[in-house]
C-alpha cells in the first residue's frame, strides 16, 4: 500500500478525522538508522504522530519539530514535519530491543520511558517559533500526542499510533489516526466515538488485514466520512553539503584549522538521515576563508 494521509470531516461533521498509512516512511527511517525492534516502534510512532499532528495544525510553509524524551533506553527522539506530508527523524540510541510487554506487544512505554516530556515547536515563518511542552502521561506516545493536543492546542482529540515490526526487524506496517472533536459535537456522538475507540483493533492489525486509511475512518464513524483531501507522505531530509559548510563557517576558526592540520579533512554526518559529507583540506580552507566564527 502506498503511503498517504487522508483528511476528512466525519460523524455528521462533528469531528475532523485524519488517518495515515506510513509503512514506507517508517521503513526508510529503520533502514537509515538501523533501528532494532523497540527503537523502530518508538521512532515509527513518533514519525506517524508528527505526520498526523502536522497535517492537522500546520498550513502552507509552516514547520514543526517534535521532541520526546522519557529518559528511557532509546533516549531523546526528534522529528521534523511540515504541512506537505514530509517528515524526518532520529533517536539517540537506535539499537534497543526489549522483552515484549504483558500484551505480547513491543514495549514502547519501556523503550521511551515516562519520566520526561513531549514538546512541539511550531515555526510559522514569521515571528519567533512557539513551543508547547507537556509531561509524558503514558510513554506509549498515542496518549501523549492526545494529551499535547488537549493541553497546548485546547483541542479534545484521540490519537492512535501503530507500528508492526517483523521478526527480521523489517517494518511490517505503520499507520495511525487522529480525531478532533469539533465545537458542534454532541455528548451522544462523543460517547459513541469513545465506545468505538475502546472496541477497535490496533491500527497495525487493521492494516495487516488490508484496511486502508479510508477503511479505518469508516470503521470509526460507521461510514459517515466525507474525505476532503488525500496527500502522499514520505521520509525526506533536506540536508546538503552546502548547509554543513555553512555550519562549519560558524565554528571558531581554530577548530576548523585543527581539522585541517590534525585530521586533514572532516566528515559531517546528518543526525536526521545518516547521510555523510566529506570535506577535503582544500574545502576546509575555503570554509575558513569565509568563516564567520571567532578565532
From Swiss-Prot:
Disulfide cysteine pairs (residue numbers): 237-239, 270-273
Gene3D superfamilies per UniProt: Hsp33 domain, HSP33 redox switch-like
GO cellular component: cytoplasm
A GO molecular-function annotation: protein folding chaperone
Spans through the membrane: none
Post-translational modification: Under oxidizing conditions two disulfide bonds are formed involving the reactive cysteines. Under reducing conditions zinc is bound to the reactive cysteines and the protein is inactive.
One GO BP annotation of this record: protein refolding
Listed InterPro entries: Heat_shock_Hsp33 (IPR000397), Heat_shock_Hsp33_C (IPR016154), Heat_shock_Hsp33_N (IPR016153)
Protein's cellular compartments: Cytoplasm
Principal subcellular localisation of the protein: cytoplasm
UniProt-listed Pfam families: HSP33 (PF01430)
Sorted UniProt keywords: Chaperone, Cytoplasm, Disulfide bond, Redox-active center, Zinc
Record-linked NCBIfam families: PRK00114.1
Known function: Redox regulated molecular chaperone. Protects both thermally unfolding and oxidatively damaged proteins from irreversible aggregation. Plays an important role in the bacterial defense system toward oxidative stress.
Family: Belongs to the HSP33 family.
Protein's name in the database: 33 kDa chaperonin
Gene that specifies this protein: hslO
